[in-house]
Swiss-Prot record:
Domain remarks: Contains a C-terminal catalytic domain, and an N-terminal region which modulates catalytic activity.
Cited PANTHER family: PROTEIN-GLUTAMATE METHYLESTERASE/PROTEIN-GLUTAMINE GLUTAMINASE (PTHR42872), PROTEIN-GLUTAMATE METHYLESTERASE_PROTEIN-GLUTAMINE GLUTAMINASE 1 (PTHR42872:SF3)
Keyword field contains RNA-binding: no
SMART domains: REC
Encoding gene (name): cheB1
Catalytic residue positions: 207, 234, 330
PTM comment: Phosphorylated by CheA. Phosphorylation of the N-terminal regulatory domain activates the methylesterase activity.
Protein name: Protein-glutamate methylesterase/protein-glutamine glutaminase 1
Any GO CC annotation of this UniProt entry: cytoplasm
InterPro entries in alphabetical order: CheB-like (IPR008248), CheB_C (IPR035909), CheY-like_superfamily (IPR011006), Sig_transdc_resp-reg_Me-estase (IPR000673), Sig_transdc_resp-reg_receiver (IPR001789)
Boundaries of every Response regulatory domain copy: 4-121
HAMAP family: CheB_chemtxs
Length: 388
């Protein structure tokens, strides 16, 4: 079944360009265009598209207000277009709070090294959102997400997982023979027995859907959380400072954008800067972060694989690593190294993911002990960390 798309933008050029790109994909079809948020709300109710692409700054009604109204009345997956500025980052985070599921920079040259890559990325994001479940927006305090049925007839299949090296594989499918032996069925937090391990760090890696998921989890942590927390969220460099500031204002724990040389301390979360790689090194009892540009051929900056791999060397078996919602397979190879070192790996379950790519890759590879609903992830982490 074709994924039907509503394009919303006050720029006639951008409406036309996005429509052309969408219609180039045989799996996608533009069924309507709107020039402002008010039109978008009306057309969303009438046309019932599978996905909406939405600008933020528009006359009559802005994109954030439109997202709130659509998600309150006719929940539909929404992909925001944003400028890579401080104000653009804040507005995009507001849109995600309101219920939008993902975002892309409005300037295509900001998201790709060439035209073909930009086209592929936009089409891929729309396909993934059109195939997934949608959720009512979380409140700023992290209220429970409410699942809604996906469109009938839309396939949720993904490409088969292939071989990869750290941070380079975008594949996100499943191998059926492996999945039969993997913990992909959701485990309630109440059924998880604390292992009693003395962890040195909590690591959380995520991509699409991650900002809302991280907010939901971290706002439930007490200021006395006993371990440092390393957060790896696929996000442009212009966005991570605003995201760290937002989380810090909402959470009892401290949240900051990671800086080179930061000494890790309990009860503090360090967000990997966009466009950089975050690694951890340990000398005696002191653990510090290294924040570097890294190799130019890496698909992800920051990369979950890179941070996980460094933690496996620094902390051996003393890591609790969690892979949340996200497109691709980043985190799988780093999780493999952590697993080999004896660390504990968990994944978010399929039903609560915006995109079940990264957690699926880890679960299907047999690396995760449990797949856990986003609603219960904080409870499970706190229990395992000795705070439950």
């Amino acid at each position: 079944m074709t994924i039907q798309v509503l394009v919303v933008d006050d720029s006639s050029f951008f409406r036309r360009r996005v429509s052309e790109i969408v219609n180039q994909d045989p799996e996608l079809e533009v069924i309507g265009v709107a020039v402002n948020g008010k039109e978008a709300v009306k057309m969303a109710a009438e046309l019932k598209p599978h996905v909406i692409t939405m600008d933020i700054e528009m006359p009559v009604m802005d994109g954030i207000t439109a997202v709130r109204e659509i998600m309150a009345n006719n929940p539909i997956p929404i992909l925001m277009f944003s400028s890579l500025t401080h104000d653009g980052a804040k507005a995009t985070l507001d849109a995600l709070d309101a219920g939008a599921l993902d975002f892309l920079p409005k300037r295509f040259e900001d998201i790709a090294t060439n035209k073909d890559e930009a086209i592929r990325l936009l089409q891929q994001r729309i396909r993934e959102l059109g195939r997934r479940r949608i959720y009512k927006p979380l409140s700023r305090a992290g209220a429970t997400a409410v699942p809604a049925s996906a469109r009938a007839g839309l396939s949720s299949t993904s490409p088969t997982l292939g071989s990869s090296t750290l941070g380079r594989s975008p594949a996100s499918g499943l191998a059926s023979s492996a999945s039969r032996n993997s913990p992909t069925v959701s485990t309630p937090a109440s059924a998880i027995r604390a292992s009693g391990k003395q962890y040195k760090a909590l690591l959380i890696g995520t991509s699409t859907g991650g900002p809302v998921a991280l907010q939901k989890i971290l706002t439930q942590f007490p200021a006395s959380y006993p371990h440092p927390i390393l957060l790896i969220q696929h996000m442009p460099a212009a966005f991570t400072p605003a995201f760290a500031t937002r989380l810090n204002g909402l959470c009892q724990i401290e949240v900051k954008e990671a800086e080179n040389g930061d000494q890790l301390k309990a009860g503090c979360a360090y967000l990997a800067p966009g466009g950089m790689q975050m690694m951890v090194e340990r000398t005696g009892s002191i653990s510090r972060l290294k924040v570097l540009a890294g190799s130019s051929d890496m698909n992800y900056k920051p990369s979950v694989d890179i941070t996980f791999a460094s933690a496996s060397k620094a902390f051996n078996a003393d890591v609790l690593a969690v892979v949340l919602t996200g497109m691709g397979a980043d985190g799988r190879e780093g999780a493999r190294m952590l697993k080999t070192s004896g660390s504990t790996i968990w994944a978010q379950d399929e039903a609560s993911c915006v995109v079940y790519g990264m957690p699926q890759a880890v679960a299907v590879a047999g690396l995760s002990t449990h797949s856990i609903s986003l609603d219960q992830m904080a409870e499970a982490i706190l229990k395992e960390s000795g705070r439950g």
